[in-house]
Design a protein with these regions (language model features):
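DNA major-groove recognition helix of helix-turn-helix/homeodomain DNA-binding modules
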Residues: 51-66
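Short, conserved catalytic or interaction motifs in soluble domains
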Residues: 39-42, 72
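Short alpha-helical DNA-recognition segment
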Residues: 20-39
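Short amphipathic recognition helices of helix-turn-helix/homeodomain-type DNA-binding modules
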Residues: 66-72
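A short, Lys/Arg-rich alpha-helix, primarily the initiator
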Residues: 1-18
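Alpha-helical residues within the helix-turn-helix
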Residues: 17, 28, 58
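Residue-level recognition of specific faces of alpha-helices
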Residues: 11, 36-39, 66
């Protein structure tokens, strides 16, 4: 696991928890598989397509650009 994967996962978890969302709720809002959210938050390397970045960002209340910069 790379440092950027871990950082992205930590930020996603923090944003999700601030909004009082569970992983299943975030997965549903972002229209992503729960396993994808779980892997992401645990710092595993996942391939974020532009579409997935957009859906995840909207579900977390941030822009796609902000989310992309976290994972850069």
């Amino acid at each position: 696991m790379s440092a950027k994967d871990k950082k992205l996962g930590e930020v996603v978890r923090e944003l999700r928890e601030r909004q009082g969302l569970t992983q299943p709720q975030l997965a549903e809002r972002a229209q992503l598989a729960l396993s994808y959210i779980t892997l992401l938050e645990s710092g595993q390397q996942v391939n974020l397509s532009p579409s997935a970045i957009g859906r995840l960002a909207r579900a977390l209340g941030i822009t796609s650009k902000q989310l992309s910069e976290i994972g850069a």
